[in-house]
Amino acid sequence: MAVRRVVTGHTPDGEAVIASDSEVASILIGDRGSSTTLLWGRDDPGRFPDDGSQPSISAAFPPPGGCMAAVMELAPEGDDFHEFVRDGLAPWADPDDAGMHRTATLDYDVVLEGVVGLELDDGVEVTLGPGDVVVQSGTRHRWHNRGDSIARVLAVTVGAFHDIEGGRPV
């Protein structure tokens, strides 16, 4: 999916300007049509005014104090859906439970299009539709798309500290 990203910034005198206006490319995940489009992110809390340049990003999820925004496109599930999700999330995924993962982030997930399921540790799944919002507090979870078309979710993640690793306190 093509996404137009408009970024604001400041001149050296502090005046607000459009720093960039361009399309952002998607990164395909597997061969079934799922993708991620990184909209913006940074490893630090930021300081303004700035010129609107893209800050550095060191990982797929931000460290404490960092943030990231992305659009996830989830293809309808098939037999291999969670296997390729697991492979794409390898450092954060549960190797024994395909698709389950946990990150040290506070996530704000907004369903833009389609119907998705959010499953937590207890196996209970909540069904979400366009306009629904999930506040994900570093919990172990997996996403489902049980429909027959692509589902789109805007995910804004804020890096946090987490005292649980792999389901066990650290």
Residue ranges and their predicted role:
Residues D107, V133-R142, D148-E165:
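A short hydrophobic beta-strand segment most commonly corresponding to one strand
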Residues M1-G52:
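N-terminal leader/capping segments at the start of a protein or of a new domain
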Residues E23, P55, M68-T103, S137-R140:
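Conserved short histidine dyad/triad with adjacent acidic residue
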Residues V24-S26, V124-V126, R142:
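A short acidic/small-residue loop/turn micro-motif
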Residues E73-A75, H101-L118, G159:
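Short, conserved beta-strand element in jelly-roll/cupin
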Residues L120-G138:
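Short acidic-glycine-tyrosine-enriched beta hairpin
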Residues Q54-F61:
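Compact, glycine-rich, soluble single-domain proteins
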